[in-house]
Curated annotation (Swiss-Prot):
Pfam families the UniProt entry points to: Vma22_CCDC115
Organism whose genome encodes this protein: Bos taurus (Bovine)
Coiled coil: 13-38, 152-176
Protein name (record): Vacuolar ATPase assembly protein VMA22
Gene symbol of the encoding locus: VMA22
Top-level division of the source organism's lineage: Eukaryota
Subcellular localization: Endosome; Lysosome; Endoplasmic reticulum-Golgi intermediate compartment; Cytoplasmic vesicle, COPI-coated vesicle
GO molecular function, one term: unfolded protein binding
Keywords recorded for this protein, A-Z: Coiled coil, Cytoplasmic vesicle, Endoplasmic reticulum, Endosome, Lysosome
Keyword Endoplasmic reticulum on entry: yes
Length: 180
């Protein structure tokens, strides 16, 4: 009876693992398409604006990332990745700043300037009126970043599923004696 339940669990984990592998392959193809699309749009923008107008000389001297990768780990060891925009705050940042007691009618205060200004759009480095292909390139690369975070989560889930499958197979081998 226990052997039958264990086999059903192995089948379930295996089907889930195969589904995750299919999703990973689809996301890889989509990522490749987005990156290819982004480079093609970037080359179109270089052609439209001139090769010297879109290049490393136009980059800002001090670059700030517009997105970051957030991670979390569940109790069973499964990691999840997601994209975090640079202007947003995490709950830890909000809570620590507003932890002090508040007065209802206190002394008028001047608002504190934000320590981190809103990130500037990198398209502004290339001028005010940039070609549409440059905006398309930026959008393609942003979609690619989101796909990369999704792929990292899927890869983590696949690795976790493989370890679960190996554990279940070991248990199954211990329960079933080998036939002579």
């Amino acid at each position: 009876m226990a052997s039958r339940d264990l086999r059903a669990e192995v089948d379930f984990v295996l089907l889930q693992l195969l589904g995750d592998l299919e999703q990973l392959e689809a996301k890889r193809q989509a990522l490749n398409a987005r990156v290819e699309e982004g480079w093609l749009s970037l080359s179109k923008a270089r052609y439209a604006m001139g090769a010297k107008s879109v290049g490393p000389l136009q980059y800002a001297s001090h670059m700030e990332p517009q997105v970051r990768v957030g991670t979390s780990e569940s109790q069973d060891g499964l990691q999840k990745f997601w994209m975090v925009r640079a202007g947003t705050q995490t709950p830890e940042e909000v809570g620590s700043r507003e932890a002090a007691l508040r007065r209802r009618k206190g002394l008028p205060r001047t608002p504190e300037p934000d320590s981190s200004p809103a990130p500037q759009n990198p398209l502004k480095w290339f001028g005010i009126l940039v070609p549409h292909s440059l905006r398309q390139a930026q959008a393609s690369f942003r979609e690619g970043l989101q796909l990369a975070a999704d792929m990292a989560s899927l890869q983590s889930r696949i690795t976790w599923g493989q370890s679960q499958l190996q554990e279940l197979q070991e248990k199954l081998k211990q329960l079933e004696p080998r036939a002579p």
